[in-house]
């Protein structure tokens, strides 16, 4: 296992020097029949990458392939011995080709991993493909050269757990290398999954990812994604043994809190990000922490958004009404803020942007009624009556939400002191006056603390079979 250790936050693209003789040195303390190489690092490692006081070291147990034979580092350090970990079959003599990291494939085959777990100031284990070649002479030096290129980056956003690097050309996979540190792909991958060692990227650390250099003269399209969304992209050329600095990667999020009405029927939610009619991207939204606020990663270069209520039985995101049930108006993305869908509206209601913290504690100032089948007879309409508080009494006419639920916005001064009780009233379909003269049936005096105290019930259901129901009702926090 090779570690790249730094005294300061700097990157290194390695050139290794190993030592070899055509007639091998034999350590008197080594097992009979063993072959040893001494590996160290030359000055090019530092000058090529402007490394400041850093060093590259082997770690005990590192494995390399020399002419297809496995050799293992018997100690850690900048200059260590490698000893054959298996007995060579047939002749084992120069010329020699050495490859890191070791694979059991053909002698000149190696693999740049498609998943790399990175840590501050260093590469992922076994991610830096290197090669050395010697014709055979009295000198005992093998110079390892990088086949890989390196991407340096930081993550500016807290909480990011995974990035995916993708390209129009291969970035990783199984490769066949030659003595000049060139390569051909035998089983390539156009993506590399990058994960932090500690589970979450730190915003204060620098990370490095090893990638294959760009083949050919043309640049390649390159993108950095998280949660399937591109957050940074460009047209680049990766060069062997050099660094491409991706600088700071910012993952932008936007948020939406649906109304209780929108949450009827357990929909899913999606965000439609766009620049114009031709440049757009659908992104699924999630509420992983169950706080009622849904999140989406903002794609690079798309400054506008429409939040959509979607059919949960269909995963397709488009404007077909079988899939998209309801939508907001066109909005400018407010990074880090949450859009609150206006209560009692289905489409294009004038919602409000809130800070994320406020959105998480937001409660609609609305009360809902779910009448039973008795109450819905004879085309009755419904009202709420606030009373027994310091603000006197107030009648509120309730409007149908979807034929099952009825709702009305409460006064701005509503609390359990100003209005201690609420009475739900079934009203005569032949009358329009908002008073007791239009009453057919009613609930009892219900405590408003049901709505003002946690768990903040907002919907009152008249229990089945009831007419004048007293307190025979069921309160719920959602419309169900």
Roles of regions detected by a PLM:
Residues 2-8, 12, 16-278, 359-388, ...:
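Sec-type signal peptide cleavage vicinity
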């Amino acid at each position: 296992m090779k570690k790249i250790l730094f005294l300061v936050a700097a990157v290194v693209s390695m050139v290794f020097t190993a030592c070899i003789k055509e007639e091998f040195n034999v350590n008197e303390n080594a097992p009979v029949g063993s072959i040893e190489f001494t590996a160290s690092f030359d000055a090019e490692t530092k000058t090529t990458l402007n490394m400041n006081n850093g060093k590259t070291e082997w770690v005990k147990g590192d494995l390399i392939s020399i002419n297809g034979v496995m050799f293992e580092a018997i100690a850690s350090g900048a200059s260590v011995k490698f000893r054959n970990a298996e007995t060579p079959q047939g002749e084992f003599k120069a010329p020699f080709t050495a490859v890191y990291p070791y694979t059991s494939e053909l002698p000149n085959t190696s693999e740049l991993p498609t998943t790399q777990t990175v840590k501050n100031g260093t590469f992922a284990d076994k991610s830096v493909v290197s090669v050395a070649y010697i014709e055979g002479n009295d000198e005992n030096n093998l110079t390892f050269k990088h086949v890989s290129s390196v991407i340096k980056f930081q993550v500016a956003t807290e909480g990011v757990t995974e990035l995916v690097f993708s390209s129009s050309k291969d970035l990783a996979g199984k490769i066949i290398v030659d003595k000049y540190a060139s390569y051909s792909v035998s089983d390539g991958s156009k993506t590399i999954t990058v994960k932090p060692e500690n589970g979450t990227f730190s915003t204060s650390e620098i990370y490095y990812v090893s990638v294959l250099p760009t083949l050919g003269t043309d640049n390649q399209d390159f993108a950095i994604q998280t949660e399937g969304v591109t957050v940074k992209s460009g047209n680049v050329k990766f060069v062997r043994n050099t660094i491409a600095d991706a600088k700071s990667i910012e993952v932008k999020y936007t948020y939406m809190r649906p109304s209780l009405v929108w949450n009827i029927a357990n929909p899913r939610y999606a965000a439609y990000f766009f620049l114009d009619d031709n440049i757009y991207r659908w992104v699924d939204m999630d509420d992983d922490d169950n706080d009622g606020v849904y999140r989406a990663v903002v794609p690079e270069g798309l400054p506008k958004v429409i939040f959509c209520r979607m059919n949960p039985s269909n995963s397709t995101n488009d404007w077909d009404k079988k899939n998209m049930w309801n939508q907001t108006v066109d909005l400018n993305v407010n990074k880090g803020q949450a859009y609150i869908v206006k209560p009692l509206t289905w489409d294009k209601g004038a919602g409000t942007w809130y800070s994320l913290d406020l959105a998480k504690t937001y409660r609609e100032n609305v009360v809902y009624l779910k009448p039973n089948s008795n109450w819905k007879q004879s085309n009755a309409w419904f009202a709420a009556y606030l009373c027994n508080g310091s603000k006197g009494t107030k009648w509120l006419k309730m409007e149908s939400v979807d034929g099952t639920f009825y709702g009305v916005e409460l006064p701005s001064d509503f609390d359990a002191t100003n209005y201690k009780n609420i009475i739900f009233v079934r009203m005569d379909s032949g009358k329009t006056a908002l008073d007791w003269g239009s009453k057919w049936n009613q609930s009892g005096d219900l405590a408003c603390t049901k709505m003002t105290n946690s768990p903040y019930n907002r919907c009152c259901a008249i229990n089945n079979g009831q007419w004048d129901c007293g307190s025979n009702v069921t309160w719920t926090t959602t419309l169900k």
